[in-house]
Amino acid sequence: MKKKVLATLLSMAMVAGVITGCGGAGTQSAADQLAEQGVTEIPAAETTTEAAEATTEAEAPAEAAEIDLSQQVDLVFYVMGDAPQDEELVEAALNEKLLEKCNATVDMQFSTWTDFQQKYANEITAQSADLIYIANWLNYGQLASSGAFEELDDMLDTVAPDLKALVGDANLNMCRVGGKIYAVPNTWAEYVCNGVKYREDLRAKYDLPVPDSLENLEAYLLGIKENEPNQGLLTVTTEESQGLKTGFDAAWALNFKYNWVANNGLDYGLAANYDTPSEVYDYWYSDDFVDDMKLMKKWADLGFWSKSALSDTNNSDAYKNGLCVAEVAGQNPNKQITAIADFENAGQGWESAYVAYGETNGVIYPGHATQNGTAIVRGCKDPERALLVLQAMLCDDEINSIVQYGIKGTHYDVVDGIYKNLQEEAGETPTFPYEGFNTWNLRNGETKLPQKTDVKLQEMFDKYAVLGEKTKFPNVNIYDGFSENYDSYSAERSAVSNVMRQYLAPLEAGLVDDVDAAVEEFRTKMTEAGIDKCREEYTK
């Protein structure tokens, strides 16, 4: 199967050779949810500001245009996750500065981690937010193609030249969809290598292997089960599995086995290896898939997860609270650093360790620019003011510090250049932790305050950089810049997603009686849903 999609990705990788957050809901992505609702294009909304209607004929970056700030604008900023306890207190401090410099305020709205894909889709459809967090794992490219976000090319020159200069053309170009810029990424280069986060203290206590392969992960879990039969092992559900690759969390562990171009393979059960990205092959209809599903059933029968896992909701604090001994889906180095801090604060002698899938399968690269970014929602009440506020939140040191760390002297202090949370230091639960607004999209690499744990994080990044240099395309993410246009097969795509929820999820959860029969039924249902058309169009 000679396919254009990966060849396109490969050319993107060459252009992006200068490359410098997370998750939880059901198998449908936000883009899928919109398609199912019949929304394939987000209509443009009227804007009340004259400045937003103006265009510029400048062909090179210009000085910031004079913007009318006479009227206060109140904006809504939609971000992921849960709100911090001191949300209102920090917002008040933030808005005091934004009113002074932009005559604007922001109301931070949070998705929570329950059904966040559906909530994100609803937010896009309703156009109730002005600024919104975007990421490749939230299908930024597909949503941008549908018209969900404002084009930023001209406004970056006329409204926010400082922001454009800070981010740089290379990063902005990686955010282009159809030749247009629809998002502004953060400026902190990081590795977001997915992997397994696990309890190192229990591994060492019972002399178990590091869970760095399917075989060793199984031995690690079995060893803990035998020694501590009442200890939960994996709190896997359908919630980390999103898009059109997997239906159940546990299947993420299969990344140990394959050196795929992207974690969990490609959409529609296709796959390609990182070293040979133009050679796309069929995974769902392969013998490997059958073998993998038999492994999932073995693990389910061994009691590695609950028999009600398909209907369980995501407990994002399960690992933190000792309810499980490993997490295999949606993990990354930053989540490991958070776990280290959580365990230290808990004071129970727990220790968290991390192994990236790429350490075993040989595929390691830094995060794409669209890993964490900000877009202006189509329908924003004042796009220019929104971009001006975004510039202030990223470029203004005082404002950025409030957004990321809270109020100095109340929530944090800086000692010898290191961030210190004052409540944690006093043995209290932080009411505004580090990056308490979950604004990973507003990380400024030039001014980001390091935490004590950042020493460990940088050690992880340094290790991954060395491993990434040994790959065929050294430290280049050749996949995440790809954007799928599924207008011509949206009905089939939706049907395929439904089959994944109904038939693939139980297979990957091992909650079927006969794997061979269940695989056959899954494949039959996929054919009926139109998988062939999806694959043909996807790989044109």
Roles of regions detected by a PLM:
Residues 9-10, 22-540:
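Extracytoplasmic/secretory soluble proteins
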Residues 1-10:
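Positively charged n-region of N-terminal signal peptides that target proteins for export
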